Amino acid sequence: MSLKSERRGIHVDQSELLCKKGCGYYGNPAWQGFCSKCWREEYHKARQKQIQEDWELAERLQREEEEAFASSQSSQGAQSLTFSKFEEKKTNEKTRKVTTVKKFFSASSRVGAKKAEIQEAKAPSPSINRQTSIETDRVSKEFIEFLKTFHKTGQEIYKQTKLFLEAMHYKRDLSIEEQSECTQDFYQNVAERMQTRGKVPPERVEKIMDQIEKYIMTRLYKYVFCPETTDDEKKDLAIQKRIRALHWVTPQMLCVPVNEEIPEVSDMVVKAITDIIEMDSKRVPRDKLACITKCSKHIFNAIKITKNEPASADDFLPTLIYIVLKGNPPRLQSNIQYITRFCNPSRLMTGEDGYYFTNLCCAVAFIEKLDAQSLNLSQEDFDRYMSGQTSPRKQESENWSPDACLGVKQMYKNLDLLSQLNERQERIMNEAKKLEKDLIDWTDGIAKEVQDIVEKYPLEIRPPNQSVAAIDSENVENDKLPPPLQPQVYAG
């Protein structure tokens, strides 16, 4: 993809983000500008062409061998192995290396493959010797619970997924490109089976494929991310060194339409950097893409707040380059390669995830090829900045003033905020102490009033009257009763 740098800033024609074959999907530098679908077609064509050339070479060598054999009568009995057998053996070895997803779902091939695999490797199957990590167990449980809602279709998907993981366990010696091809074939085959046989709606197919990707890549991550057989780590170190060497690049040089003096914009920039750094902590390609998407949306929000209008593509790419330079994400190339190799290809070909990922690839390519002309600098200044002899930031510091330095302005603003917070805290503490004193005084006053009342009106407890009723007693004071009620004594 060609990147153009003009005085008004970095510009990328949006058509250059698309597949160069003209299919309408997003292309990728790792696929030589093709989309996933077209790249696979071109790759298979080149592969078939190479196989055909090897076949023709083998036939030519066989003819030469036969001619030499016919001309040499003395060596007829000594030669026990003809070149045809050698050719057959070579062809069988090539055929064995061709891995397609049909091998994973064909019953006959599974039986034969398992026998050969058992003989070649004695390691236990990952379905038996499962990883015990908490994350893997959690993802497995979530995947099983998710498939339960699909009943018979879910059982078939789970069976196919387990077979795929078992097959991949014995294919770790293959190159990372061949393992990637196996994974992409598996994605494509499962999606086609659900759409044709299962009659599953496209939106549900997408959700199922997301869960399948999450399940299998969580298990395969430590084997296929930045493997030792590739130069991914070397590329990571190279891009990190390159970004550190470009630490002097300012937003003005890239024509970044973002004003970090605005607090909301500064927060968005920090969030964007955090998101793109967080990408390395994710294990699933879809989750890594989600970090790129969140980073990009924060960039668009920062531009929108600064310009008070929606951001354009010409505004987005320079800002993304600036975020990458400022954040220097860890293992950037490894993450890009991992997403390219093992993400569900439909995500990279269409949608906002594919668009943002393609722009990130463009940003990395721009950083790798960045020169004086790209930044509208003279070659002399560019060389001085790269060598560390001087820096544009040093030149700005010569005319330093508190109002001109963004960092110092932010520092004074923060100090003012701290001073205000300190005053508020002192007021709150004084009011809290006053409230505490009032509560103590109120409690003491209530206690004193209660004590005064108790002393003034003491509580006396008297024993109950134990006297019995004396109605028939002679000691009753009858004289106090009215005459009709006075008892009369009769002589008996």
Curated annotation (Swiss-Prot):
GO terms for biological process: endocytosis; protein transport. InterPro entries: DUF5601, VPS9, Vps9-like, VPS9_dom_sf, Znf_A20. PROSITE patterns: VPS9 (PS51205), ZF_A20 (PS51036). Residues 69-84 have a biased composition (Low complexity). Zn(2+) binds at C19, C23, C35, C38. Residues 1-74 are annotated as: Interaction with ubiquitinated proteins. The modification Phosphoserine is found at S125, S133, S374, S378, S391, S401. Gene3D superfamilies: 1.10.246.120, 1.20.5.4770, VPS9 domain. Rab effector protein acting as linker between gamma-adaptin and RAB5A. Involved in endocytic membrane fusion and membrane trafficking of recycling endosomes. Stimulates nucleotide exchange on RAB5A. Can act as a ubiquitin ligase. This is Rab5 GDP/GTP exchange factor. The lineage of its organism: Eukaryota, Metazoa, Chordata, Craniata, Vertebrata. The gene is RABGEF1.
